[in-house]
Amino acid sequence: MIKAVKMNTSFDKEKVRKHLPGAIFLSLVVITSLWLVISTISWMTDEDRLPLSHMIIQGQLKHITADDIREAIDSMDSIGTFMTQDVNKLQDALLSLPWIAQVSVRKQWPETIKVFVVEHQPEATWNNRVIVNPEGVVFNAPMSDLREPKPALFGPETSSKDVLDFWHQLQKQFEPIHVTVHSVALTERLSWQVVLDNGIRLELGRDSREERVERFIALYKQLESKKDSIDYIDLRYDTGAAVGWKSDDVENKEEN
């Protein structure tokens, strides 16, 4: 047989009265804390608070100016506050400048951004359109920005590093004969053509490139006294070379 049990639902008024002040105090603390958090977040994200109004620029600037950097950042749709601005977006905006190779942006409390810039170093021009850095990487800066003459390199779009490496090699090999390389071209058929600073054009062809360069060096030592009259030297032979002279007289063409 199941007996019914009557639940005691009466409140202990004394106990409630005893704990009520503590509960009210705790509630006030929680509410106040939430209000402070919300107010702080609102204050820190307010565009009128902590605006990024100062900039420190570091790095050696030769081809761009501090004004170029400021204009790139000002061109963004909007610039946030110290708390809201994503530095990656600032970096992306600066990397759109053609002379910037690397950039690092940091925020400094309370209203400053620090920008460290590394410029591309121009080593040569490429296909009379753009510029190559010392690693053979092409970057799309205007050639008119160059402050001194650079060697002219030509070739298929993906060959910039190979052509630059060959130019470096020739510069070293030609030091003993006191000539420098004005331009190096690799044709679509992978044939090499070199123009020296004295205007002499070398036809090296596709094969036996290293041997033909050595052959030219030996030949040039013999012809150095006549260098001002030489138009081109064609080394696309198993042995020897054909020398083309600037004179129109075909009798001045020599076979060596």
Swiss-Prot record:
The chain crosses the membrane at residues 24-44. Its main location: membrane. It holds the Pfam family POTRA_1. It comes from the Bacteria. It is found in: Cell inner membrane. It is a single-pass type II membrane protein. Residues 1-23 are cytoplasmic. Residues 50-120 form the POTRA domain. Gene3D superfamilies: Cell division protein FtsQ/DivIB, membrane protein fhac. InterPro entries: Cell_div_FtsQ/DivIB_C (IPR005548), FtsQ (IPR026579), FtsQ_C_sf (IPR045335), POTRA (IPR034746), POTRA_FtsQ_type (IPR013685). GO terms for cellular component: cell division site; plasma membrane. Keywords: Cell cycle, Cell division, Cell inner membrane, Cell membrane, Membrane, Transmembrane, Transmembrane helix. Residues 45-256 are periplasmic. GO terms for biological process: cell septum assembly; FtsZ-dependent cytokinesis. Part of a complex composed of FtsB, FtsL and FtsQ. This is Cell division protein FtsQ. It comes from Aliivibrio fischeri (strain ATCC 700601 / ES114).
